[in-house]
């Protein structure tokens, strides 16, 4: 329970992407820049979808293993600024919305007042394969999707206990003579509070980075439905898969991508954050059809971040967006 508490407090809590006035100035700046990059990415995808022919489905799929809400927040901001597209998070309902994988197969059309014309509105599907901080498990069959304006009250527990680094050192120093509870000097009240925290934490519909990450039936169902959807999309003709920030260490997703490479018209781009990442990914999935884009070295300015990724895919005339990068098989 202690580890889950520290994981939420130090990592997962940031995934809500709230912009608070009392946050550190550098953190607020980084979040604004990140949100802006997400907006630019989505806006460019919408523009690209709009160029599709009349007989093509105007839809793009974003598969992600991230829990955070940057895609949702960026899309909301674009929609409020009148960018015309449908953002589909897979949920269906009005006041209460539930996740339904079949919702990713829908399209929306705009029709003229006198039915003289109609056109398909671009759709972006966001398929969150490992769940989201905006999801809650209702029961063994349902996941509720909602977007809170504040952190979950029942998870906002402030305990006077060691941070994770201090805890590791304490356990290492006293593991031969003390239990973990004794090493961390946890009181009975601390243990009780951690148990209550864990009960609320387990209501989050996310895949935890543990060996037992798919033990919940409801999440097994969602995950494998997502895999089938990914496989189906990659088997379509003239498909482009762009991988950014993905290590290929999820063996199920890696296997789907590996099998899909038999599709003769599939194009796969893999963006590597560091120079060494290409060889690390190559050890996991090695195919001559994969195009790697990676830094020539790890000097400042050559790292791949979201802004650089956008510049490379949607290059601007007059700007050499590939400077310092290598594009190879």
Which residue ranges define each predicted feature?
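Active-site periphery "cap/insert" segments of enzyme catalytic domains
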Residues: 1-122, 126-139, 221-235, 246-257
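Active-site-proximal helix-loop elements at catalytic-domain edges
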Residues: 17-31, 197-216
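Short N-terminal helix-initiation segments at or just after the protein's N-terminus
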Residues: 1-7, 61, 65-72, 174-189, ...
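SIR2/sirtuin-family catalytic core signature
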Residues: 116, 167-197, 209-329
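Conserved beta-strand segments of alpha/beta enzyme cores
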Residues: 61, 125, 205, 289-291
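Glycine-rich loops and low-complexity Gly/Arg-rich segments
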Residues: 87-89, 150-157, 266-269, 294-295
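Short, surface-exposed amphipathic charged segments that create phosphate/polyanion-binding patches used
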Residues: 101-106, 141-148, 304-316
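Eukaryote-biased recognition of electropositive, low-complexity segments
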Residues: 77, 105-193, 238
């Amino acid at each position: 329970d202690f580890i889950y508490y520290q994981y939420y407090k130090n990592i997962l809590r940031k995934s809500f992407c709230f912009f608070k006035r009392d946050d550190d100035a550098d953190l607020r700046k980084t979040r604004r820049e990140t949100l802006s990059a997400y907006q630019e990415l989505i806006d460019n995808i919408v523009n690209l979808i709009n160029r599709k022919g009349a007989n093509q489905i105007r839809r793009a799929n974003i598969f992600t293993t991230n829990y955070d809400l940057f895609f949702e927040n960026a899309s909301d901001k674009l929609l409020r600024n009148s960018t015309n597209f449908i953002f589909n998070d897979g949920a269906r309902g009005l006041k209460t919305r539930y996740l339904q994988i079949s919702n990713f197969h829908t399209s929306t059309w705009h029709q003229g007042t006198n039915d003289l014309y109609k056109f398909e509105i671009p759709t972006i599907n966001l398929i969150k394969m490992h769940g989201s901080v905006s999801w809650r498990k209702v029961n063994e069959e349902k996941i509720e999707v909602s977007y809170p304006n504040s952190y979950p009250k029942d998870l906002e527990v402030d305990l006077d206990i060691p941070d994770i680094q201090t805890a590791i050192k304490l356990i290492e120093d006293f593991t031969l003579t003390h239990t973990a509870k004794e090493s961390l000097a946890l009181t009975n009240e601390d243990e009780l509070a951690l148990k209550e925290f864990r009960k609320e934490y387990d209501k989050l519909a996310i895949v935890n980075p543990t060996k037992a990450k798919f033990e919940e039936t409801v999440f097994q169902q969602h995950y494998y439905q997502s895999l089938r959807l990914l496989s189906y999309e990659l088997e379509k003709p003239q498909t482009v898969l762009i991988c950014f920030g993905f290590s290929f260490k999820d063996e199920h997703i890696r296997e789907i991508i590996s099998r899909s490479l038999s599709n003769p018209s599939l194009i796969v781009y893999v963006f590597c954050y560091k120079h060494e990442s290409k060889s690390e990914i190559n050890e996991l999935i090695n195919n001559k059809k994969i195009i790697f884009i990676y830094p020539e070295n790890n000097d400042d300015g050559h790292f791949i971040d979201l802004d650089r990724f956008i510049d490379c895919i949607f290059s601007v005339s007059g700007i050499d967006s590939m400077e310092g990068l290598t594009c190879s098989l």
